[in-house]
Structures are given as C-alpha cells and as structure tokens.
A protein has these predicted regions:
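Left-handed beta-helix
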Residues: 35, 44-237
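Conserved core of the sugar-phosphate nucleotidyltransferase
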Residues: 1-35, 39
C-alpha cells in the first residue's frame, strides 16, 4: 500500500489501528526508479539542514512532494512465513550474519536456486589450495567449513570457519579461523587470525597475531563489544 507518513526511530511511534501493541517498522530495504532517486539525492545534497539519511530525510521529503512511495509486507502472503532479514547496521551484527553462511544448513542459503542472487560477478581464475604437507610437515593448504571465491590461493595455510573475498592470498603455516577477509588481503607466513574482519588491501606481515590478545589488539585496531577485531581498509601494519 501507499505510505501516508514515515517516522525514523521515534521515541513514541504510532501504533497500528486496532493493534495498540504493534507498529509498522521499516526494514531499510529500498527499491527506486533510477531517475527518481538520482533527483532526490541531488536535492538532498543541496540541503544544508539535512542529515543525508534515507529514513530521516529522503523518504519524508519524497512524501512531502507527493511522490508515490509504497510499502510491501515482509510476510509471504501465501505461506505466511517471514523471509530472511538481518539488521547489519552494527559490526557485530554484520559479523554474525556472515558467520551464519558457513553453517551446514544456514537460514540464508547462497545455494538456494529458488532465491538466486543477481549481481555483477567479476571474472577470476578458480580458487586453489597448494601443498599437502608431503615436503614439509605442517605446510598444508586446507579449507574447512568456509567460503572461498575465485582468485584465492591457499598456499600451505589453514582456513577454518571463515569467509574470504576474491584475490585473497594465504601463505604457508598460517591459520585463519572464524574471520572475514575482504578482497586483496594477503596473509604472510606464520600469521594467526581469529574472530576478525580484515578489510580490503591489507597486508598481514609474517608472524602477525590478531584476535588472540584483545588488549594488545586495541592498541592498533578497533575491537567491538563482542571481541571482533576490525582492521580497516588499506591499513599498513
């Protein structure tokens, strides 16, 4: 249906008529016609009083202009079952949502053909693991309970319960566990990483240890409330 009004995180939200204990909540999922959103973003950018936020500024302004803004129910009208949704506005929530994907039967299954993900897929060579511990004991390219895309090379290191982005290089005798590594990350020999998010284009030097001593990690990186270590994009270590 068409939206009559929009409030962003009000202290006393308006309730649903005849349901005083319930409210309609925005899930932050938007679909726009390109010319419309382009114009709205230009208008908002010129507004010095705007916080440049979709919920606080852009959507309410569209309603003031009388534009057609509609809302769609999260529930499946036929099955009456809620589909998958996670609020990933906080780093800890983002981490947990990603870790869900490496479960044996995740709630959100990337391999579900009924819910394909349509996005641009850059072409990379296949991922590969090298070294099987035959020449040097402990030098094993091993991946367990993890997701690794094209362009990745696991060269004698271990990746356990982790998610890698394209073009990640893991060198020998390293161990990556319960972590998220973004595109272009290189991890040198003997490094150990646990419960961390390593952003793009970070080079982890030889012997570096992240996630095992949070007090030490706090001196160099950001650590969330739940103990996830975040290494920012392009950080030089």
């Amino acid at each position: 249906g068409k939206i009559a009004g929009f409030q962003e995180k009000p202290k006393n939200p308006k309730t649903i008529p005849e349901k005083p204990d319930k409210i309609y909540a925005s899930m932050g999922i938007y679909v726009f016609k390109h010319p419309v959103i382009e114009q709205e973003l230009h208008d908002d950018a010129r507004n010095s009083k705007s916080a440049h936020d979709f919920g606080r500024d852009i959507i309410p302004q569209m309603l003031k202009k009388g534009l057609k803004v509609c809302v769609y129910n999260f529930l499946d009208e036929n099955k009456r079952e809620a589909q998958y949704w996670r609020d990933i506005g906080a780093i800890d929530a983002y981490y947990e949502a990603n870790m869900d994907l490496v479960q044996v039967e995740p709630i959100f299954n990337l391999y579900d053909k009924d819910w394909p993900i349509r996005t641009y897929q850059e072409q990379f060579p296949p991922a590969k693991t090298v070294f099987a511990g035959e020449e040097i004991p402990g030098r094993v390219g091993l991946v367990l309970d993890s997701i690794i895309p094209g362009g990745c090379i696991i060269s004698g290191g271990k990746v356990i319960r982790s998610i890698l982005s394209p073009n990640v290089r893991i060198d020998s005798f390293t161990e990556i566990s319960d972590s998220i590594l973004m595109e272009g990350v290189n991890v040198a020999r003997y490094a150990k990483i646990k419960r961390a998010i390593i952003d793009k284009d970070v080079n982890i030097p030889e012997g570096m240890v992240i996630g095992y001593d949070l007090e030490e990690d706090k001196k160099n990186f950001f650590v969330t409330e739940s103990g996830i270590v975040v290494v920012a994009k392009g950080t030089e270590i």
